[in-house]
Structures are given as structure tokens and as C-alpha cells.
Amino acid sequence: MTTFVDRVVVHVRGGDGGNGCASIRREKFKPLGGPDGGNGGRGGDVVFVVDPGTTTLLDLHRRPHRRAAPGSPGQGNNKHGADGADLLIPVPDGTVVKDLDGQVLADLVGAGTRYVAARGGRGGLGNAALASARRKAPGFALRGEPGEERDVVVEVKSVADIALVGYPNAGKSSLIAAISAARPKIADYPFTTLAPNLGVVEAGEIRFTVADVPGLVRGASQGRGLGLEFLRHIERCAAVVHVVDCAAAEPDRSPLADLAAIRAELAAYASLDLGGPPLHERPQLVVLNKIDIPEARARAEAAARQIADAPVFLVSAVTREGLRELVFAMAGLVETARANRPAPEPPRIVLRPPAIAEPEFTVRRRGSAFIVDGEKPRRWVAQTDFSNDEAVGYLADRLARLGVEDELARLGARPGDEVIIGGVSFDYEPGIRAGVGHPFGPRGTDPRLHAAAPPATAHWAGDGDDDSAARDEEDG
């Protein structure tokens, strides 16, 4: 029997972008072939896809770390690397994806619905794309960007039209087995059902789905008895059917007391706003069950006379008495809910242009170090191959054009001060004069880094203060 898993925390990471290629065309009778290094491929995305054949999150529970394929590196002769394949993760219909703070990221309903949980990194540019009038044959290429990485909470909420709720051992499983082809485990003890069971019911021309929710107890809305785990499975239901055990022999139990307790739990449950009314305000039916027992029939008839706020049905899942009337009443609620369901809105395209006055980077001081933050500086550092002096010089040029060096000088940075960008620590050396002059010299070198002034060095910062490279369009 398949284990039912309806909540799991998953670590997802998009594939890294492929590195660009630094290559020079070498061909007979072509003395100035020029750069021909191709770009790296884009990393694959991690995508959740609704699959009707998937009913549990067991596979994600067993393998909670998922990573998409990286992009291939570029090659010479202007060959671009292949994009990494997307990682498609099948999930059940009704899956909700949240962040660790509980914010809903996606509500996946309907076969084929997708959500990109982690995007792959963009591929680095090859030296052919970096060539310019000033740098005709770059001896370096850009590294691929790392893919997005995050932890997400994946939950399954049953997609059903009708929810059967009630105390443990109230006969909900017997009822769904009697009105549908579902065959849940049935036994004469509480909490036999530990996972929701779904059954398809037909009433005339109306076909609908019923969910048998595991038994609720007092305090379920606060999590007692795994109530929170069970209650979220009825958030999508259009109507609620209260199944009341009229044969319960406990001294503190009665049909009316059980009904009031379950209604109170539904009213106290703070469900997510999925577009429907609160659970206790949805259409309700009351089923007084087990009337095949003489004492239970007497209790049911007495309780039915005191319930005036919802239709009441006296049924027996064993003898099937009253089931036909109950099924058609359920179908009527489903038909009304479907008729009143608002038409889905077409997707809206929202354009959010960047604010003109928003700075592209910020510099703050922390002790004797300077922290440079911003999408472009972080991304540029992540793309730089620090084993290549020409690539380091290119980074210095980009930062200088952005105004980072001027801002450091304005804040009083001195030679040798630590500057951290994107998790990489640099020794500030204004004598390099980045951004000016022409870096003549062999490919892969930059004469400015070997001048009389002490060279700038870089190493990974150990404090992890800055985030990984952010995504943005390539600049120059």
C-alpha cells in the first residue's frame, strides 16, 4: 500500500549556467581570425507539474534535494553550449507551494499546471560576444551564473466537491465506500483512516468527488490530534457533510454535542484565503449515521427534531437506508456551487519598470570593511574568472563605470581596506586606475595589475554576508 505523504520541505536549485569559451580562430591564411568563443548554455529550471497519476508526495519525501541540469560550456568556432534540461517534478492535483514563512507561492490545480520553483542560471558570454573596438580579442570569457536555490514547503490539499467530516469512528469511511467505488480501510476503532480518501459519486447526470477526511477531535483547529493536517484537505470543498455517530456510548457524547464541537472547530480554523468562504459558512448537510442500530435510530430521530439550520438525513451505510436521498442532496449542492463559480480571469500582464531614482548599488561600512551591494556588482563578480588577470581588469572597468570606486573614495576608503562584493573579498587599491587607459598586453593579462602599486587581490569572504549573484540582463 502506498504511503500517503501530504507535506514535505524540498530544497530546489536551478542548474548553473555554462561557462563562456575564450577561443581564437586559427585557420590557414587567416592571420587575424579574431575571437570565436561561444556562449555557455542556460541552466535548467526546477518545475512542479500537476500529474493526475500522482497522489502523494512520497517521492519528494524520499528525495527532498532536487537540482536541475547545468548548461553546457561554450566552445570554439562560435559554438554555443546546450541549455540544461528542466527538471519536471510531478505533484498531485491540489498542491500548494509555500516559502518557509508560509507565504503561498503557487496553488496548482488542474492537470498540467506548472510552477517554476527555481530558475536556472544564464550562461556566460564567450569572448566573441565580449569583443569591442577597444578590446578586439579578449583573452577571457564570463562564467555562467549559478541557478536559483531555495527551500520550499510543498503541501497537498485534496481537490473534492464534498468533504465528509466528523469524529473518529463516525462511519465516514463506510459511507464513502457505500456511495462510491472507493475502498478505504474500515475497522471498528478510532483513527482507522489516517489519510484522506477520495471517491467519485454519480447522481443522475451529475458527477462529483467526495473526500473522507480523517477524524477530527476537540482542539483540531489548534493542531490537536493532527487536526491541522486534516483540516487543510477540506479547504477546497464546496460543501461540508457532517457525519454524526448516533451509536456512540460515551457518557459525554451525544449527536448534538458532536455536531456542535465539529462546527466550532471549523469556525476556529484559520484557513488560507483561496477565494472561498470560511469553512463554517459553506453549505452543510447533517448525516445522522448508524440508524441500523435501534438505540442509534432513537437518538437520531430525537436529534433531527432539534437541528433546524441544515438539512438532516438519517442513514445507514450498512443497510444503505437513506443513501439515495443523501447523494442527490449532495449533487444539488455541487450543482449550485459550480453554477455560482466565477469564471476564471485571463492572465494579466503586469509591467513593473524599474524606478528611475533607485540606485544600482549601495556601499555601507562595517567596521574596517566596505560592503558593496547591488544586482549588477554581485552578478559581475560571480561571472569573473579570478585566475585570469584580463577578466579581473574587465571587472574593475565595469565597477568603475558604475561608480563603485568613486563611491568608495567618497566614503574614505584607503589602500588595503577590505571591500566585499557578492561574497568575495578584495583589497582596495586605487592605484590600479581601473576604467582608464587601454589594457595592452598578451591575452589573459592586464598590465594595470602588474604596475608599481601593490596589486589588488581577491578571495572568498568567510562571513557569507552577501547573497549569491542576482539575475539581471547582461551589461555590455
From Swiss-Prot:
One of its GO terms (molecular function) is GTP binding. The keyword Metal-binding applies. Residues 450-461 have a biased composition (Low complexity). Residues 61-85, 437-476 are annotated as: Disordered. Its cofactor is Mg(2+). Residues 2-159 form the Obg domain. The keyword Magnesium applies. GO terms for cellular component: cytoplasm. Mg(2+) binds at S173, T193. GTP binds at residues 166-173, 191-195, 212-215, 289-292, 316-318. Residues 353-430 form the OCT domain. Gene3D superfamilies: GTP-binding protein OBG, C-terminal domain, GTP1/OBG domain, P-loop containing nucleotide triphosphate hydrolases. InterPro entries: G_OBG, GTP-bd, GTP-bd_Obg/CgtA, GTP-bd_prot_GTP1/OBG_C_sf, GTP1_OBG_dom, GTP1_OBG_dom_sf, OBG_GTPase, OCT_dom. Its EC number is 3.6.5.-. Monomer. NCBIfam families: Obg_CgtA, Obg_CgtA_exten, PRK12296.1, PRK12297.1, PRK12299.1. Belongs to the TRAFAC class OBG-HflX-like GTPase superfamily. OBG GTPase family. This is GTPase Obg. It comes from Acidothermus cellulolyticus (strain ATCC 43068 / DSM 8971 / 11B).
